[in-house]
A protein has these predicted regions:
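Asp-based, Mg2+/Mn2+-dependent phosphohydrolase catalytic module
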Residues: 136-185
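Conserved Lys-Pro-Asp/Glu-containing loop-to-beta segment of HAD-superfamily phosphomonoesterases
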Residues: 4, 112-142
Length: 185
């Protein structure tokens, strides 16, 4: 029975994927032709394992190893990458011996927060959700906005990944303790 959901963002969180400016330059040099697109994140070239040696962020990878070995835990990749790139994402993960229960790509306008909520229907016994992301914007505008929609008995932990460090920035348990302390004062 699944009791925990752990969601890792892909780019810049679990995986140290190439950034657009550098990536386009390297891709052009290795292929011997100009990079053919103006965009980056929605293009399969951005995850071309024949061009890039794409590795995981070590601290986040260590956390992944801990989470994937924890019983009753469903580990997912929760990315803003499009569904059409799912095969490239799988290849990068497999190349790094990363195997998750699910890759959740963006295929609608739903935020990551809304996509997380859907797992409560899929696994009604979940009592803990932990998310790992490198975007403060996503944390503030997509995860924090769903806290009030979560059951009271559910622990919701948000970790910010920056410079290969994990920082717990939000926890529903911390909020409950803070509220109770305020009531006592």
């Amino acid at each position: 029975m699944i009791k925990r959901l752990v969601a890792f963002d892909f780019d810049g969180t679990l995986i140290d994927s190439p950034l657009p400016e550098y990536g386009k330059l390297v891709w052009s040099e290795k292929k011997g032709i100009p990079y053919p697109h103006s965009g980056w994140w929605s293009k399969p070239e951005s995850l071309d394992i024949d061009v890039f040696d794409i590795k995981p962020n070590p601290v986040v990878y260590s956390q992944y190893l801990k989470e994937i070995s924890t019983p009753n835990t469903y580990v997912i990749i929760l990315t803003s990458r499009l569904k059409k790139l799912e095969e490239q994402i799988k290849l990068v993960l497999e190349q790094n011996n990363i195997f998750v229960n699910e890759i959740n790509t963006k295929n609608t306008n739903e935020t990551k927060g809304i996509r997380i909520l859907k797992y409560l229907d899929k696994f009604p016994e979940i009592n803990e959700i932990s998310v790992f992301d490198d975007s403060i914007d996503v944390i503030e505008n997509e995860y924090n906005t769903i806290k009030h929609l979560l059951p009271d008995n559910l622990s919701f932990n948000i970790y910010f990944v920056n410079n290969n460090k994990l920082t717990l920035v939000e926890s529903k348990i911390i909020d409950i303790i803070r509220d109770e302390l305020i009531k006592l004062i």
